[in-house]
Amino acid sequence: MPDVSKSPLAPRRFPRIPGVAGVRLAVAAAGIKYKRRNDLLLAALPQGTTAAGVFTRSGTASAPVIWCRDNITSGRARALLVNSGNANAFTGDRGMHDVRWSATRVAKALACRPAGVLVASTGVIGEPLPVHRIDTVFPRLIGELGNASWYQAARAITTTDTFPKGAYRRCQIGNTEITVAGIAKGSGMIAPNMATMLAFVFTDARIPAAVLRSVHSATVDRSFNCITVDSDTSTSDTSILVATGQARNAEPESISDRALKNFKQALLEVYVDLATQVVKDGEGASKFITIDVEGATSNTAARKVGLAIAESPLVKTAIAGEDANWGRIVMAVGKSQAQVDQQLLSVSMGGVLIAHRGQRVAGYTESIVDQHLTGSEIEITVNLGLGAGRARVWTCDLTHEYIRINAEYRT
Amino acid sequence: MPDVSKSPLAPRRFPRIPGVAGVRLAVAAAGIKYKRRNDLLLAALPQGTTAAGVFTRSGTASAPVIWCRDNITSGRARALLVNSGNANAFTGDRGMHDVRWSATRVAKALACRPAGVLVASTGVIGEPLPVHRIDTVFPRLIGELGNASWYQAARAITTTDTFPKGAYRRCQIGNTEITVAGIAKGSGMIAPNMATMLAFVFTDARIPAAVLRSVHSATVDRSFNCITVDSDTSTSDTSILVATGQARNAEPESISDRALKNFKQALLEVYVDLATQVVKDGEGASKFITIDVEGATSNTAARKVGLAIAESPLVKTAIAGEDANWGRIVMAVGKSQAQVDQQLLSVSMGGVLIAHRGQRVAGYTESIVDQHLTGSEIEITVNLGLGAGRARVWTCDLTHEYIRINAEYRT
C-alpha cells in the first residue's frame, strides 16, 4: 500500500457494525503482496444461505470472477474467500486452477461443495497468485472463524484504499428485525459496470435466491453503477449479497412484496453508503461531487449524461482547482451522446443557476459558485428540459495525488 | 495562454511551409482573451475553391460549428475566419448572430456571399464572443491579406498549445506538381470525433467537392479520429480541407481515380503529422505513445481497443511513471467492449512480448521494458488473435502537468 495518508473525505470513524446471525469472519496475513497486514478474509455462511452477484463486464475478467459467475447461478453460498494484493487476472489456466484449489480447500474445511465457495481477488493484474502463501496460513484462517470484526474484515480486503469501508442498517420484514451489514473496497480503476471494487453485503433476512437476485441488481444499479473515479473498468469487480435466513422472517415471494419495502430501502442505503465511501476514497480525491441530472428522456439517458460529466478529466480538474468552469460541464453533456437540445439545457452548481435554456443567465456572478467550490462537497445539477428521466451520480475530483499514486503503484 | 514551457515532445522547429497558390493569409491581435498576441486568422480563397469539413459530434456544438456544417454542404468556400480565446459555444441565439455578423463582415470585404465564409472559434465555452474587439481590428486584417506566414497563422489559432503546428507535403496529380499545407491547434479536450482541435489544410489541387469530401473523411478517420489526449470531446472540433484548383491538374472523377494515389498519400501524411503534433502537445505530455492493435475482428474493433487503451488514465499514469504495468493494458482491452478472447490475447511493449495467449510469457524480465519506458516514444502492441482488423492510435501520458494546466486554465 503506497504511503498515502487518509483521504480528507473519509468518514470520521468506522461504524459499529453489529454481527449478522450466521456469518463467521476470519482474517489472516498471508503476505501475498503486502507485508505485516491481513490480506485474506474468509466468511463462513450457514446452510440455506442464498446469494446473488453482479460482476465486471470486462472482456478480460479475472479467474475469480469467472468462477463466481458460474457458481452463483445456483443462488446458494456457504463461504466467501477474498484476498488483496493480487487480482488473479490474466493468469490463464493456472489462474482458474488456483481458484478451484482455493475453493476446494475452503470446502473441505467447511464440509461443503467447492461450488458453494465464492472467491474474490483484488490487486495487481497478470501475476500468478502465490497460493503457497495462502496454503501456509490456511489452518489458522479456519481456526479463527468467528473471531474477526467487521473492521478487520474491511481492512483485509483493501489495496490502495486509505480507509476501510463499512456500513449497516437495521430494518424490518414484517415484524422481524433484520440486519444488513456490508464492507467494500476500492479507490482507483473505479467505474460503473463496475470498478476495482469489491462489495460484500450480508443480511440475516430469509430471501429466496430469485428475489435476492432482483433486489441486488436493482440496488447495484442505483449505487455502484452510479459512481466513477477514473472511468477505468476493472477485471475484478464483484458485488455479492448473501442472506443467511437466520432471522426467520416470512419468505417474500417477489421483489414487489410489500413486506420488503423497508428492507429494500435499508439495502439501498447500505449500498449507497458503501459506494459513496469508495468515491470519497477515490485516489487523490479532495472533493466529493454529487451530480443530479433531471429532465432527461429516460433514467438511463440521465445516468449517461451524469457519468459523462463525472468521467470528464476536464470537469474533474477544474473542480480540483476550485474553478467554476461550467463550460466544461456543457462540453461533457455534449459528448454523452444522450439526446440533448442545448437550447433547453440548464446548469447549476451549489444550487446557483448558472446557465438556463442554452445560455449564461443574465447577472450571473461567479463569486457565489466560487465560494461553493472551496468546500469539499460539490453539487452539480443539470436539467435537460426534455422529460422526466433523472439520475444521481457520484464522483471525485482529479488531483496531483491521483497521478502520484498511479504512477507509483506497482514499483 | 498559461505560462507553460514548450512540450518536451515538440518538433525541433516549425517546418518551412511553401505558399499554396490562391491562399492569402492575414493575422491580427483583437485581444479577445489573450493580450499582446495575434488571435485572429483570415484566409482568403479564390473563386472556384472547393471545401470539405468534418465537425464535432458533440450534442452541444458551438455556433461556428453549426454555421459551417450548414454552409459547407455547398462544397465551396471563399474564406476562413478563425479566432482563439473564445469558443463561441453555448452562447445561444447571440452566438449564432455573432457568427453571421462575422461572416457577413468578411463577405462584404471579399465580395462574396456570407455562406462562403467558414468560421471557427476555440477557447472558453459559455462566454459571449466580444465582437466589438474583432470589429476594431477588422480593417487591418483585410488590409494585411497575403502578408502572414504559415507560422504566424498557426500561432494565431493556438490556445493552451505550447508550440504552433504545421505540416506540408509535395506530390503529383498526373504530371502536375501539387502542394498540401496545413496548420492545426489542440492540446487538451482532445478525443476522437473529434477534439478541441482545429485543423485547416490547403491545397492548390483541383478536386471536385464530392471527391474532396470523400478523401477528407477517409483521411480524418485515420488521423484525427485516431488520437486522444484526455477523452474529452470538444464543442468546437473542426477539420476543414480546401482546394483552390490553381494547380490546374486534370480533375479526378472519384476517390478511386488512380491519379489521386500520390495525393491521397501526401494528404494522409500531412494529417497524421498534424494529429501526432497535437498529441505531442497533449497537456502535460512527457511521452508520446503509439498503440498498434492487430488481429481484431475488424479495423473498427481494432480502433475501439486502441482508443480504450489510449484513454485509460491508469495506463497513461503508469507510463508517466515509467512503470511496465501491462496488467492495466489488459484491463483497458477488457473494458473496450470490442470482441475479445483473453486466451488469445498478446501484449508487447517496446517490441518485447510480455504476455502471449492469455498469460505472461515464461521468463519475461521486466528490465528490458523498463528501459524502453525511460524513453520518450513508447510503443504498445496488442494482438487480439481473432482476425485481420488493425488500427494505429496515438496518445500521450497523463502527468502532474496535465492537472496543473487544467486546474488553472480559466482563472
Regions found by a protein language model. Name each.
Chain A
Residues 2-100, 107-411:
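A structural signal for small-residue-enriched, beta-sheet-centric alpha/beta enzyme cores
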